[in-house]
Amino acid sequence: MKRIPEPFRIKMVESIKMTNLEDREQALTQAGLNPFLLRSEDVYIDLLTDSGTGAMSDVQWAGLMMGDESYAGSRNYFNLCESVEHFFGYKLTVPVHQGRGAEQILFPCLIERMRQVRGGTEPIFISNYHFDTTAGHIEMNGGKALNVVTEKAFDTESYYDWKGDFDLDKLRDTIATYGANNIAAIITTVTCNSSGGQPVSMANMRAVYEIAQKHDIPVVIDSARYCENAYFIKQREPGYEDSSMLEIIREMFQYGDMLTLSAKKDPMVNIGGLCCVRDHEELFRAVQTRCVPMEGFVTYGGMAGRDMEALARGMHEGADEDFLHYRVCQVAYLGERLREAGIPIQYPTGGHAVFVDAAKMLPHIPAHQFPAQSLCNALYLEAGIRAVEIGSLLLGREPETGEQKVSPMELMRLTIPRRVYTNDHMDYIADALIAIKDQAASLKGLTFDYEPPVLRHFTAKFNSL
C-alpha cells in the first residue's frame, strides 16, 4: 500500500512521552490488566478508540469562538440542523451529548410504539451487528439484540468488499421467527464496527429497507462512520464511481427512517451526537420529551453551543473525499504492513481501524480466556500502545442464563484517531506487533477478578492465568 501524505498542515502539537517497561508493568497491574483503566499519560500511542479523539481543524476551532450558549434557541443549533438536512435530508433533529444519548432517548420510544401501535410483547432489535453500547441499551430496556451480518465477515483471511452487509435470508428468517410485530426496529450500522469497520453496500441498505417497509418495521441508521461507508461505496460499488460524497450520503439515508449518530467519529468533534427523524412528527415529539430530563433542553441536548457549531462544520470536513482517501489509505497501510509480516487481520481493512485476528494469532487461548484482551496487554507492555478487545469479552453473557457468549471473532482493534498520528506512527505500531508475533505462544489467558453486570469490558479487572 502506497503511503499517502497527510492532506493537512500541523498547527499545534501535543507532546507524548514513552515510558519504560517497568513503568508500564506497574501501570497495567494497577489497571487490573484492563487497558481501559490506564491513565492517558501512561500511554504512548492511544488506539483505544476513534471516538472523540480526533484533531479538530482551524475552521472548527474558529467556530468554538462563535458559540451561542443560550439555554434555548441557540443559533448554533439551527446551523447544526442545516448541516443535518444538507447531508441526510432529515428535518427533525435532537442534539445529544454523544451517540449513546441518542440510543437512550430513542429506543424506549421504539419499544413503546412496538407495543401500542403494532401489538408486540417481546421487543427485538435486529442489526447487521450491534455495537456494545447499542446492545447494552436494548437489553437494559428489556429488549433482545440479534445480529444477522453476512457469514463472509467471519472469514477474516478472504477478501470481500461488503463484510458489513446484512445476511438478507437471515433477516427474513429472524422476522418470521419472532414475528414482525415484535421487531421494535432494524438497525443498520455503518460502517459495521464489530465485523472490522466493514462497509455496507448501497444495494444491501436498499434491500434491508424494502424488507422493513414490507413488514412496517422502522429502520434506524447507526451512522457513526457514515462518511467512511460512503467512501467505500464510491470506490467499490458499480454505478457510484462518478457520484459525489454528498449524493451517496443522501441516498444512504433514504434507506432509514431515523438515525443515531456519535458525532465523535466522522464529524471529528470531541463530544456530541444526534438523534434525527426523517419526517415522523409523533416519534420526534416522543424523543424530545425524553431528551429534556435525560440530556437537556431540545435545542442543546447536553451539548454546548460551541460544540454544536464545531459539529456543524465538522460534518462538511468529514465528508471531504481527499481526506477520506488519505484516512482509508493510512489504515490500509498499517494493515498491509501486518499482513506482510504474517500477522492475521480482518481483510480487507475497514475505514477506522485494523482488526488483528487474535484467535488465529493466539490459538492456545480459548474464547472464555479472552485472547484479544491478552494481546492488547502484550502490545501495551511491548510498546506503550493501547488497543481494545472486540470479542467475547465485549460480547458479554446471555441475559437470561448468565452463560458466557462466544464471539464468532476474537479481534484486537487498532483504532486510528482522525488527523492525529502520522504514517511513522503506523510503522512503530507495526514493528511492535511484529515483535510480539515471535513470543505469541508465551502469552496467557485471563480470568475475572471483578466483573461488572453491564458493559463489563469498560471497568472489569482481571488476573493472568
From Swiss-Prot:
Cross-referenced InterPro entries: ArAA_b-elim_lyase/Thr_aldolase, Beta-eliminating_lyase, PyrdxlP-dep_Trfase, PyrdxlP-dep_Trfase_major, PyrdxlP-dep_Trfase_small, TNase
Substrates-to-products reaction catalysed: L-tryptophan + H2O = indole + pyruvate + NH4(+)
Cofactor(s) the protein requires to work: pyridoxal 5'-phosphate
Keywords assigned by UniProt, alphabetized: Lyase, Pyridoxal phosphate, Tryptophan catabolism
This enzyme's EC code(s): 4.1.99.1
Pathway of action: Amino-acid degradation; L-tryptophan degradation via pyruvate pathway; indole and pyruvate from L-tryptophan: step 1/1
Domain of life: Bacteria
Complex formation: Homotetramer.
Protein name (database record): Tryptophanase
Species of the source: Shewanella sediminis (strain HAW-EB3)
